[in-house]
Amino acid sequence: MKRFLQQLLSVAALACLAQAAVAAPTYVGVKVCTKCHDLYGDAWAGTSHAKAFDSLKANSKVEEKKKAKLDPAKDYTKDKDCVGCHSTGFGKPGGYTLGKDPGGPERLGSVGCEACHGAGSDYRDEHGTAEKKLLRSQQSTPRKLIAGKGQNFDYEKACAACHLNFQGSPHKAAKAPFTPFTPTVDAKYKFEFDKAVRTKALHEHYKLKGAFEGEPVPKIRADFQKTAKDIPE
């Protein structure tokens, strides 16, 4: 009887793990995000993050690659040590996979929306629901709801995962494969979060309507909202 109970508990535990794995948020891609956030998408499309995958191609960024002791004539688009920081969700459910069309409908072959905001399958519908609630009853939705469904608000950590992922980095979570593009190679690779996001924002910022309230709130949000544009009617 005891053995039977142990086996039963083991099966139950495995079932829970399987359910958790199935429930993990997946990446949906830029096209899904920009169905509603089209203005942000248009602004992002002109940034270097939108074109990040192109720099892995042969004969692209020649001088930069030479400085980092890489071969400018080599195609790095299928190098797993490079692709992770030039795509969205590499190695994660629904994320970019080697050989996938980087410019396909999802545009996962770029540093897109979810590279900063997190895999969107679980929280994206909550945005629509919250906006309808705001319009209907003038009530905001707790931001912790979308945070609990995978939306990321720790932008500094998201940036550091690539921009500070080199040997000797001050970023404690830095780990192999390390980027060869370090401040010792060229001073332009020195990354300071506050300075970088203010001088090279990843997209235009628009005034928020108040669909969500409460923590977590990125510390830079208040500054961006001071100069944010009104959303055109």
Task: Kindly label every feature range from the protein language model.
Residues 22-109, 120-152, 182-233:
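Sequence context of c-type cytochrome heme-c attachment sites
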Residues 33, 82, 113, 159-162:
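Short cysteine-rich clusters marking metal-coordination/redox-active sites
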Residues 139-171:
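Repeat-solenoid scaffold signature
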Residues 86, 117, 163:
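Helix-to-catalytic-loop junction in kinase catalytic cores
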Residues 1-12:
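Bacterial N-terminal signal peptides that target proteins for export
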Residues 122-124, 167-177:
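Substrate-binding/catalytic groove segments of enzymes
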